[in-house]
Amino acid sequence: MGKKEKKEKNTNTSLFDMDANPSFKRSLPIALQHLLAMIVGNTLPAIVLTGQLANTEFAVSAQDAVYLIQAGMFVAAIATFLQLYPVFKVGAKLPVIMGVSFAYIPVLTSIGIKYGIGAVYGAQLVGGVIAFIVGMNIKRIYKFFPPMVSGTVVLTIGLSLYSVALNYMAGGNGNPNQGDLVYWGVAFLTLAVTLCCNMFGKGIIKLAAILIGIGVGYVASIFFGIVHFDGVKEAAWLTLPRIMPFKLEFPIDAVITMSVMFVVNSIQAVGDLSSTTAGGLNRVPTADELEGGIKANGLASVIGSLIGGMPTATYSQNVGIVSLTKVVARKVFAITASLILVAGFIPKFGALMLSVPQAVIGGATITVFAQITMSGMKLIMSDEMSSRNVTIVGLGIALGMGIVQLGDQALSRFPEWFRMVFTSSPVVLATLVVFLLNIIMPKKTIAEEEAERKAMDDK
């Protein structure tokens, strides 16, 4: 009986069954859609990080910058395969595409500027272990992170990234011609094309909006003479991932900051996985799927820290494709992951992406950061906006954004590690504020608050 069932399972060629085995010919078009939807987003975090470090004492070489893009491809492929085909219950066994996450950029940048790239990956290694532990205990701790709390974190991440995008649109740090009209023109051309494709395009045009926007901006940049191909010419055609490409360092303040980010983003992963199962399978994820998915994310981040890849997350644009097409056959996603992996072996690809002017990157990423911000607002609004919740969210954002804007001078009398944790990024302080206030402040619904006010009037 078992053999018969196995045979029937192997002959199932449906695109709409997770365990089916559709033909390569039928699977490839959907797999390419997923690839186009994530490929640019997967390369941009490494470009942004190396760009932010470019004019500091910890600037990375052009060769290492190319390698970071490659490593991001390796890690995205590894994380996706883990989620598709779990190993020892590490993985969700769900149809998802993983990619390098923008959510960590503010913290990664602040750590890199202060301590260098080795500290970035040292802190990430510890954070990945923390995420794995969170996954093991997700059933017990999830209740402490309602949408209001996780939404405030996501909103703060989006707000903190705007200055990065706008700086890039102006030409980038260290550019003697920063602010030139050419940079702003190319940036807004990229933004306009991206918006038009996203708002008016359909099918593959809509899915590849950012890629098309960058392509048009890139061609315009070549015309204006602000693209340099030296790095592309010098890059090799093939290379293998390197083990420990950077010496890992573990500054305590960097580790604390990164650990907080991993805890919060692990909780956020619950929402990402829920979106996948709701859109493609019309159900909520099981406890085992949530646990396995978060543990896989943690393990992928640990592996990433050892080969130079940044932390990963589920890509919402790929979740959107699942919801739209209802294609959930894991083979389709495995083909996408395989293509991502192949790209990771080709330095020319990374060098080509690195040759994209910062103005073009800024024009493309401003839309991504705006979407992150609005996603946070939607999460917050999914909870009741009672006076209690409004107060908690408002204080979290005010303190988080306010302290960072003031900089070190606001906490000049505090220890250095304390200043690093709370002034490097608004995300950490905002997270702690909303988390603690949500536990401490008595929970009241809008109806209960109205009843209290009515009782006061009656007196």
Model-derived segments and their meaning:
Residues 50-91, 259-330, 456-457:
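Membrane-embedded helical hairpins/re-entrant loop segments and their flanking transmembrane helices
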Residues 1-29, 230-242, 278-285, 293, ...:
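Intrinsically disordered, low-complexity non-transmembrane regions of multi-pass membrane transporters
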Residues 1-95, 103-111:
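N-terminal signal-anchor module of multipass membrane proteins
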Residues 67-68, 89-103, 143-152, 205-211, ...:
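Short, non-helical or kinked segments that cap or interrupt transmembrane helices
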Residues 5-12, 40-46, 50, 190-200, ...:
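Juxtamembrane interface elements at the cytosolic ends of transmembrane helices
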Residues 111-230, 337, 342-450:
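Membrane-embedded alpha-helical modules
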Residues 22-29, 51-64, 80-90, 110-119, ...:
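Short juxtamembrane and helix-loop transition motifs at transmembrane-helix boundaries
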Residues 25-41, 179-191, 208-209, 224, ...:
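Hydrophobic, membrane-embedded alpha-helices of multi-pass small-molecule transporters
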